[in-house]
């Protein structure tokens, strides 16, 4: 029996299923979480299937969370989607259910859960949920197809990143054949507000780039207040430095309210997630996140990125 069949058996065995995802969600986190919820609701209308977590204001157009009570976890199956390690799981009640399943595509550095399905070759967790439906012959409702397509598009950078495979395109084509409003979804995913556009201009104006293509920019709390932006809204400009031809690796340091920095790191070709692991983070080889607790640590992270950029140059 493969892992997908094992997961389906567990789903069939429980009356209540609660689905989690990571903090500071992106389209793949919400797409896989709520896409799975809607898939299971369509297949098992007699079951209670709930999605929990903080409603990210910039993504409520994609989906909103359910109200989940403490007592809902009694005897429940809990599934965590798109979350590499336990500190990043949104809503710590995930520990209070009866059985825990992890479904993810990040490196499996934290093998939590009673049953795990981790495929690091997958472009996204949304791709895995769509594959789950396909392989087990489960009919996807329109709402789930829309969510899973959004998750795939989000995590592949519109099919730009290296994890985009033949299977990714095949699954995306299958989802696209289901009649959700593709044009409206694509337009929404490509839209930023004026405040974010101005921040992007600031990033280009203030980006520090060394001779090897390592780049960085720091966004302070004062700057975020000036642009009237939340930390979550800065996610829209993370890819901006990569559009510059001379940039190969980059980091955006975003100061948090408590003074520490959330660090978003990206690379065009060279592996950077080992740097993230050394600084309270992790992620994919070319797209990772870390945490820094001083300006000196910011400098250290940038120096490590510079070293990566220098290594095997070209």
Language model segments and positions:
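Short alpha-helices
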Residues: 106-171
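A generic local secondary-structure boundary/capping motif
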Residues: 69, 90-92, 116-119, 137-139, ...
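Glycine-rich, phosphate-binding/catalytic loops in enzymes
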Residues: 35-37, 95-98, 118-119, 170
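Hydrophobic helix-and-loop "lid/oligomerization" segment in the mid-to-C-terminal part
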Residues: 2-23, 27, 31-57, 70-76, ...
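Short, hinge-like loop/turn segments at secondary-structure boundaries
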Residues: 66-70, 118-121, 268-269
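Active-site cofactor/cluster-binding pocket
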Residues: 61-115
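General beta-strand structural signal in soluble alpha/beta enzymes
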Residues: 19, 51-53, 102-103, 140-142
